[in-house]
C-alpha cells in the first residue's frame, strides 16, 4: 500500500507546478492569441538548460451559464507523465488576480494531450479527488515590488513594466507518504501590452521533502506573440481520467 501511495504522489506531483502558470491566466486575451517564452532552468552544479514554452487561448464553451475558454501551456509534463505535451485548462477568460491564483480549483476541465498514450480529460470531480487525497494546500501572493516600475528587454524591445513580488507555496501531505513543500519565490515583470500580461518572470523553486532540499532557478522571457484564427475543430478530450491507468500505465 505504501508503494501504491508513493506512485500516486508521483502522479500528483505536477499539480502544484500550476502555481507558476497562474500569473499568465489573469484577464486572458481573446481566442486565437498566443505567446512564446524562453524558459531557462539552472540547477546547482549543472549547466543552464533552455526550452521554449507556448501559451495560447482557444474558444471553449459555457459552463454554469458562464463563457469559458481553453488556456493552454505547452509542452509540459503532467501527473507523472514521461512525455511533454499541451496542457489545456477550461477557465473563465475574465479571472482577476484572486481567481487566477486558484487556477486548479477554478478549472472546469483539464485536458492533457499526451502524444504517446493519447489525450485524456479530467473533470472538476477528478481534480478534487486528487487534491483531496494528496491533502494539497497552497497560498499565492503577487504584490508590488521596489522599484514599482522597471524597463526591461523582452520580445525584441524595451518594455516599461510593473514589477511584482511572487510568493507561492504548495504543500502535499498524503497518507503513508512524506510531506512535501514546494515554494516559488521571485519577481514578475508585467506589461499590459503583452497578450498574457507577463514580459518576464524569475523565481527560485525550492522543494523540501524529509531532509532533502532541491533548488532550481527559472527564468521566463517573452520571445514573440500574435494572433491566428482559432481552429473550428474542438479539442480532442480523449479518454476519461482513470487513476489506475495513470499509476500503472504512465
List PLM regions with ranges:
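Sec/Tat signal peptide C-region and signal peptidase I cleavage site
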Residues: 15-19
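Sec-dependent N-terminal signal peptides
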Residues: 3-14
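Acidic, serine/threonine-rich low-complexity disordered tracts
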Residues: 20-106, 111-250
Amino acid at each position: 500500500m505504501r508503494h501504491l501511495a508513493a506512485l500516486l504522489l508521483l502522479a500528483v506531483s505536477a499539480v502544484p507546478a500550476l502555481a507558476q502558470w497562474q500569473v499568465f491566466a489573469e484577464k486572458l486575451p481573446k481566442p486565437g492569441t498566443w505567446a512564446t517564452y524562453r524558459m531557462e532552468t539552472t540547477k546547482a552544479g549543472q549547466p543552464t538548460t533552455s526550452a521554449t514554452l507556448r501559451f495560447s487561448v482557444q474558444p471553449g464553451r459555457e459552463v454554469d451559464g458562464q463563457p469559458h475558454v481553453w488556456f493552454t501551456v505547452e509542452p509540459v509534463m503532467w501527473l507523472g507523465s514521461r512525455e511533454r505535451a499541451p496542457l489545456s485548462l477550461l477557465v473563465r477568460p475574465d479571472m482577476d488576480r484572486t481567481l487566477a491564483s486558484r487556477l486548479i480549483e477554478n478549472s472546469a476541465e483539464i485536458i492533457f494531450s499526451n502524444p504517446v498514450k493519447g489525450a485524456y480529460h479530467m473533470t472538476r470531480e477528478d481534480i478534487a479527488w486528487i487534491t483531496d487525497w494528496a491533502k494539497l494546500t497552497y497560498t499565492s501572493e503577487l504584490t508590488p515590488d521596489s522599484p514599482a516600475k522597471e524597463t526591461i528587454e523582452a520580445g525584441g524591445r524595451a518594455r516599461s513594466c510593473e514589477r511584482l513580488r511572487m510568493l507561492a507555496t504548495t504543500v502535499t501531505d498524503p497518507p503513508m507518504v512524506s510531506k512535501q513543500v514546494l515554494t516559488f519565490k521571485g519577481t514578475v515583470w508585467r506589461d499590459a501590452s503583452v497578450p498574457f500580461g507577463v514580459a518576464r518572470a524569475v523565481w527560485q523553486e525550492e522543494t523540501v521533502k524529509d531532509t532533502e532540499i532541491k533548488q532550481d532557478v527559472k527564468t521566463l522571457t517573452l520571445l514573440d506573440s500574435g494572433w491566428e484564427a482559432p481552429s473550428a475543430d474542438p479539442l480532442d478530450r480523449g479518454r476519461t481520467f482513470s487513476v489506475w491507468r495513470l499509476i500503472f500505465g504512465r
